[in-house]
Amino acid sequence: MPPLHDIDISAVTSKSYPILAQLRTALWPQDSYEAHLKDLIDLCDNHGMTAWLAYDSNGTAIGFLELSTRPYVNGCLYRPVAFIEGIYCAPNWQQSGLGTALVKVAEDWAKAEGIREIASDTYAENWAARHAHQKWGFQETETVTYFRKNLSK
């Protein structure tokens, strides 16, 4: 892989939604490209989500980070909280420092907005993601189990 200094990280615009939708499909394959594209339009245009795409020196998209602002996040001390909704590095870019670079861009954005904490989540059994978050300087705060009950019966 090329050196990390050859990477360009750019804010997502409506013109780059199709590229981001393709990468989202790689991260979350249970949803179609079309569903991801529709979701992006809604989240970015109507709900204030911010996102960045990382490109290699050939202009190929190799990663992304999506960030929202939440009024509260479990385990955080301050409000509001910048929240990483999704982060992805193409397989050949994992453990290259690209994830760290994407998180740094999100941190800088949050600081510029006057936000004092950034948070994220992952499944408890996703050890690779948990390790990556610790490498990026995150501290685990708590593990939550969600419950549901169908009320339509």
Predicted regions and their residues:
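A short beta-loop-alpha structural element at the N-terminal edge
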Residues: 4-20
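Helix-loop element at the rim of GNAT/NAT acetyltransferase active sites that forms part
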Residues: 21-35, 75
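Active-site rim helix/loop that mediates acceptor-substrate recognition in acyltransferases
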Residues: 31-56
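Conserved beta-strand in the GNAT
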Residues: 53, 60-69, 83, 88
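Conserved acetyl-CoA-binding loop-helix of GNAT-fold acetyltransferases
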Residues: 89, 95-108, 131, 135
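Conserved active-site alpha-helix within GNAT-family acetyltransferase domains
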Residues: 100, 112, 124-143
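Conserved GNAT acetyl-CoA-binding A-motif
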Residues: 103, 110-122
